[in-house]
Swiss-Prot record:
A zinc finger (unnamed) spans 32-68, 105-141. GO terms for biological process: DNA-templated transcription; regulation of DNA-templated transcription; symbiont-mediated perturbation of host apoptosis; symbiont-mediated perturbation of host ubiquitin-like protein modification; symbiont-mediated suppression of host innate immune response; symbiont-mediated suppression of host type I interferon-mediated signaling pathway. It comes from Human papillomavirus type 54. Keywords: Activator, DNA-binding, Early protein, Host cytoplasm, Host nucleus, Host-virus interaction, Inhibition of host innate immune response by virus, Metal-binding, Modulation of host cell apoptosis by virus, Transcription, Transcription regulation, Viral immunoevasion, Zinc, Zinc-finger. This is Protein E6.
Length: 144
């Protein structure tokens, strides 16, 4: 097992980590998995809201700060974008309606809600396949 692989008994979410450690989320002090700086409380809550998983390194939990998440998103998008498709193609490739397809924002990593997916449809914007996962833009990161 590598240093980044979690043991099966290690919590995967911040909420689970808080339960296991019996501490409130606002008391968590975790390093960023990328820059190693302590992730601030607002970023801890944003990490949980974005439904991201805890990264385990050498037995210690890590989260990610907003700046590193955005930078990591941009790097992945630029280096690993496989293709860009309109919603019809995404539905066809996945074999299910857009509402049932899990899509994250490629910039901030938040899961897109149905309103955000519909915005791509309404504005004829493409979804992007990055490392085998479909990505789009959330309302916060949307740029016309």
């Amino acid at each position: 097992m590598s240093a980044t692989e979690p043991h099966t008994d290690q919590p995967r979410t911040l909420a689970d980590l808080c339960k296991v450690c019996n501490i409130p989320m606002h008391s968590l002090q975790l390093p960023c998995a990328f820059c190693k700086k302590t992730v601030c409380t607002a970023e801890i809550y944003a990490f949980q809201y974005k439904d991201l998983f805890v990264v385990w390194r050498h037995g210690f939990p890590h989260a990610a700060c907003a700046l590193c998440l955005e930078l990591h998103g941009q790097i992945n998008y630029r280096r690993h974008r496989d293709r860009a498709c309109l919603w019809e193609t995404v539905e066809q490739e996945c074999g299910k309606p857009l509402e049932e397809i899990f899509i994250r924002c490629w910039l901030c990593h938040k899961p897109l809600c149905n309103v955000e997916k519909q915005r791509h449809v309404d504005y004829n914007r493409r979804f992007h396949c990055v490392r085998g996962y479909w990505k789009g833009r959330c309302l916060h990161c949307w740029k016309p």
